[in-house]
Amino acid sequence: MSKKWTRNTAAMAAILSALCLSTNALATSEQAVTDENQTTTQQEGMRFEPRNEKFAEAHAEQYKSWKATQESEEIEDALEGDPNMVVLWAGYGFSKDYNKARGHFYAITDVRETLRTGGPTDDKSGPMPMACWSCKSPDVARVIDDRGEDGYFEGKWARLGAEINNAIGCSDCHNTGSEEFAKGGPALQMSRPYAERAMETIGKKFEDQSRFDQQAQVCGQCHVEYYFTGPKKSVKFPWDKGTSVDDMEVYYDEIGFKDWTHGVSKAPMLKAQHPGYETWREGIHGKNNVTCIDCHMPKVQNEDGTVFTDHKVGNPFDRFEDTCAQCHTQTKAALKSVVATRKASVLEMKLRAEKQIIAAHFEAKAAWDAGATEAEMEPILMDIRHAQWRWDYAIASHGVHMHAPEVALRILGTALDKAGDARAKVIRLLATKGITEEIQIPDISTKVKAQQALGMDMNKMNAEKDEFLKTIVPEWDKQADAREAKY
């Protein structure tokens, strides 16, 4: 079943998928009356309390609005909406399954259910590393605090499935054990040490920043580009040379990193994650000190007049007077028209880039089949790598048509250029092999047809996932309940 949200809403929810609690008590600290006697029920001595319900009484409005993210219940299959992506990610997990993001409430459910994490049969099997939990739960911060980063990252995704069971919540972004938080203040914190190091790399040490920068940094713990490095597949942000798409491309090339080898062209590929922080910095909102919460987590009043930060992340147009109208003088209809135009422009460029990159993948395959050498193919494959990296960077930055449309259009334009370069080179190479006719692309008009064209056994994958959900996950939940009963 397709989600009934508008596509604008889905995009906005995705870009804020980890922003929701970044400023949980921000408005409370500014405008709501704080209670000197107000306390939480956090376990004494526990630095990261992962159980969000423990804050339901002391931070009732924030908790209630956070819990309302469960209203984004229905799932929208992004591969059905754009089957091109199946081929673009051939050989990688995203070709199996890619859904639009839902609210924070579903973070654990969704990562368990996606085909990308496979159907592990024990704590040592499955396709993905532990790092795939890293932005899904405050339990991650708890485990890192208990065991260190090496103790967290080591092994497969299923290794600590019984430890990571609470959805994205309060302790991801707030120091919930602090006196400030207990009294209703925001107590923002960087709960992921690898993210804190990355911010220092770009000269933004958390404690030295303004509240504005800290708000964005807390969100940027998760809504960023990152990759897995070293034998333990630890998370690292590729910011050593800067935070632009060009800077990160150079960084990846210099260290010889690839996420996977493409299943059609054999190109060494990069998979962009969700670089919302980076594109926001480049866009008009970031440059004007408008943060994520200003648009997606506005300050609102409850019935008794208490002002708090609304944690039900969604489309700013749903709360126009509390969001857009705080800065813009245009009517809601006028602004919606502007956003729709920008979104259409980005979508058009996205689809144009996809068409060219897909053609390049199949033409590269034809060249390999015709006997091309690695030396002949290297410059072609690098152009394909760079073209798709740029395409992916633009489209993975959810809501970029709103946050930084000019950035998205520029990047997609360079993706088109690089795909064109790849195709020109491979067509010349094919000619030297005696191939001058157009290379045919199989029918990829639907998700099912595209997966069939790649020879993917979806029945097997789905059966393995179903068995995992039926047998392994209930055991995880039992173990988690037993552990938390001892807190």
From Swiss-Prot:
Primary location class: periplasm
Catalytic reaction(s) noted: 6 Fe(III)-[cytochrome c] + NH4(+) + 2 H2O = 6 Fe(II)-[cytochrome c] + nitrite + 8 H(+)
Residues bound to substrate: Y226, H274
Signal peptide: 1-27
UniProt-annotated location(s): Periplasm
Binding site for heme c 4: C292, C295, H296, H403
GO terms assigned for molecular function: calcium ion binding; heme binding; iron ion binding; nitrite reductase (cytochrome, ammonia-forming) activity
Annotated function: Catalyzes the reduction of nitrite to ammonia, consuming six electrons in the process.
UniProt-recorded name of the protein: Cytochrome c-552
Source organism of this protein record: Photobacterium profundum (strain SS9)
Organism lineage: Bacteria, Pseudomonadati, Pseudomonadota, Gammaproteobacteria, Vibrionales
Encoding gene (name): nrfA
